[in-house]
A protein has these predicted regions:
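C-terminal catalytic histidine-bearing segment of alpha/beta-hydrolase fold enzymes
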Residues: 577, 581-629
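A domain-start/cap signature at the N-terminus of enzymes
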Residues: 296-297, 311-313, 322-327, 331-440, ...
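Mobile cap/lid helix-loop segments that gate and shape the active-site cleft of serine hydrolases
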Residues: 455, 525-566
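Structural preference for beta-rich elements and adjacent junctions enriched in aromatics
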Residues: 21-267, 275
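Short amphipathic alpha-helix adjacent to the substrate-entry channel of hydrolases
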Residues: 454-471
Length: 629
């Protein structure tokens, strides 16, 4: 975000705090039964009062009128219940309906000191005729991670229905899917709810409980919410016992903190069985705890006096009678000394090429940083896996072997930036028939927003005949328009050329989504380097739309002049709900009107996604053709 953006964000934060939008609270009713989820309001809840959304957003539809859209939230010991009702005789099904209509997003947040938070789950629900639609029910954003990659379990249920002249949207969200959030274990929780109502001409209006630019803008670092107050249970049909690990990452020799929450109809002693297995399913601990229950809500914090000596992934399983009352994965980390690790690398830096040293130093720093950022309720399994891989590479290096020699699957390298001395990564993939005596064309592929470059090259982006690299955009939302992004791309290319047999006369730049704009922007910066540009699900004017005016727009003739001598490949899905197909079609028209050769693939059935097999086949043939000239 630019300096101007940070200033505007600061002003926005002050407005939220002064206006007190997060100072209210909503009281959430306790349910002693599990609602039936069919899209209709559960019949036992028809007398509960529904709330209206506080804010209405017509967006670019000034004639749009506000509808009376209501919602109801309640909870059980195992689930959060949500019902939304709209006055309509049909449901509109669109890609990413939670933004494009009809659909909604639920934010569950952990309050922080400044009334905004960067600890949250942003959960998306997009009604769909296909119940297996990938974005039907999904954790869209977690602690500002924007991975869009975590599905909700089958214990979370979502249905929609049209009945009696209205549309109902009903959710039963499993607390286990939003761990550690739970009304009986969390000191306080907050929420926001946003509903996108589809209207004519593929447009939508919006409704929210509190105003929060983060609903639409992934660059907003903190989110706004309203506190939740959960009603204490007045009566229960049966006793409830829940076991919870208060930490899901520990060090070797640490004990296990277990929190037992009990809610009982009577006073009784209940035995609790706790079993811990390693990742090979071998039992390493099997013990029993007697829990004294009383006719009230109780917390019993227990620390298991058992030390695990070996780092790894473990599984916690707790039962009471025939009931499973707690089931968690947790990770035991070794005790690290990163200063000693870096010292070993530097002391041996002259044994192998300097880029291997840079890569190992980058990986050591990355693991240390991620461990520091790890929350108590997160396992850190990916960090442990990353460390084990790094440890293997380090041992190979200390034996004077290059751990990266001969790898043809995608892997990460790093260079030391000559501009700020930071270690910057990129992912590289070599052809299966790679030989250091043969020269290869180079494909530079730029990733999308809110993510890094890891995983981009897991699918071939060139048909397998190119050396492929995916530079990391350290400013993950700036459309590759900053000096640092352009310098990082150039330094990644220089690093590859220094260590691999690249034919520098046969380079192509490509990108997906934000990376599509980045490909246009990067070619514009260095047209002398590339034989062609490929734009996948991109936006030719994205920087001006996201960052404000003053950036190259590739819908303007002045910025298209450098493209006159090279071919351009453009792919887009007509159902793309993230970046509209109209912009891609306008780009194609502008390129052609400027005499630029365009290969276009506008697919009627595709959304915001990578190309289909047929498009890839055409694209790979295009790559081969333009680099053989």
């Amino acid at each position: 975000m630019k300096t101007k953006g940070y200033f505007l964000y600061f002003v926005w934060c002050m407005i939220q705090i002064v206006s007190g939008q997060s100072s209210q609270s909503d009281k959430i009713r306790f349910l002693d039964f599990t609602p039936v989820i069919d899209g209709k309001l559960d019949r036992k809840l028809i007398h509960f009062k529904q709330k209206e959304f506080n804010h209405f957003f017509p967006f670019d539809n000034p004639a749009a009128s506000r509808a009376k859209i209501t919602y109801l939230i309640a909870y059980t010991p195992t689930h959060l219940y949500l019902y939304i009702e709209t006055p309509a005789d049909s449901i509109t099904y669109r890609d990413r309906g939670f933004i494009n209509g009809d659909g909604f997003k639920l934010l569950l947040a952990k309050p922080q000191k400044d009334s905004l938070t960067d600890e949250y789950y942003d959960i998306a629900f997009s009604p769909s005729k296909d119940k297996k639609y990938w974005a039907r029910k999904r954790i869209w954003d977690y602690n500002r991670n924007q991975s869009h990659g975590k599905k909700l379990s089958t214990e979370t249920r979502f249905e929609e229905i049209v009945y009696n002249g209205k549309c109902g949207f009903e959710v039963l969200l499993a607390w286990k899917d939003v761990d550690p959030y739970h009304p009986w274990f969390s000191e306080q929780l907050g929420y926001n709810l946003y509903f996108a109502k589809a209207i004519a001409n593929d447009a939508a209006t919006g409704y929210s409980v509190v105003k929060d630019e983060g609903i639409w803008d992934e660059e907003i670092p903190k989110r706004n919410f309203i506190p939740l107050v959960f009603e204490k249970p007045k009566r229960i049909n049966k006793s409830v016992l829940i076991a919870k690990l208060t930490r899901r990452n520990i060090r070797v020799h640490d004990s296990f903190p277990v929190d037992l929450m009990a809610l009982s109809k009577t006073t009784e002693i209940r035995p609790v069985q706790i079993t811990i297995r390693n990742d090979s399913s071998k039992i390493i601990l099997d013990t029993k705890i007697d829990c004294s229950l009383k006719n009230k809500t109780q917390h019993k914090l227990t620390s298991l006096k058992y030390s695990i000596l070996k780092a790894g992934l473990y599984h916690f399983f707790s039962r009471s009678g025939n009931d499973t009352i707690g089931q968690y994965d947790f990770v035991v980390f070794p005790k690290f000394d990163f200063d000693s690790i870096r010292s070993q690398i530097v002391q041996n830096q002259y044994r192998l090429e300097y880029e291997t040293v840079n890569t190992l130093l980058f990986k050591a720093n990355e693991v240390e940083k991620q461990l520091h950022q790890l929350k108590p309720y997160e396992t850190g399994k990916k960090i442990l896996d990353k460390y084990f891989l790094f440890e293997t590479e380090l041992h190979s290096f200390l034996k004077e072997n290059d751990p990266y020699k001969g790898i043809t699957k995608p892997y990460r390298r790093a260079f030391k930036s000559k501009y700020d001395n930071s270690f910057q990564p990129y992912t590289i993939k070599l052809p299966q028939d790679y030989s250091p005596t043969k020269k290869y064309p180079l494909l530079v592929f730029l990733h999308g927003s809110g993510q890094d470059e890891q995983g981009v090259l897991n699918q071939t982006r060139s048909g397998g005949n190119f050396i492929e690299i995916a530079p990391f955009a350290r400013d993950m939302y700036n459309c590759y328009d900053s000096d640092s992004s352009q310098k990082d791309i150039m330094e990644a290319i220089e690093d590859v050329m220094d260590h691999f047999p690249v034919d520098k006369s046969k380079m192509v730049i490509a990108g997906f989504s934000m990376g599509g704009y980045g490909a246009l922007r990067t070619y514009y910066q260095h047209p002398e380097l590339y034989k062609g540009v490929a734009v996948f699900a991109g936006h030719p004017d994205l920087a001006n739309e996201w960052l404000g005016s003053g950036h190259p727009s590739f819908l303007e003739d002045q910025f298209l002049a450098p493209f006159s001598k090279i071919p351009v490949f453009v792919y887009h899905g007509r159902k793309d709900g993230a970046l509209p197909v109209a912009k891609a079609e306008e780009l194609i028209r502008k390129l052609k009107s400027n005499g630029i050769v365009v290969t276009e693939r506008i697919m009627d059935d595709k959304t915001h996604e990578y190309p289909d097999d047929e498009t890839n086949k055409i694209y790979f043939e295009w790559l081969t053709k333009i680099t053989e000239k």
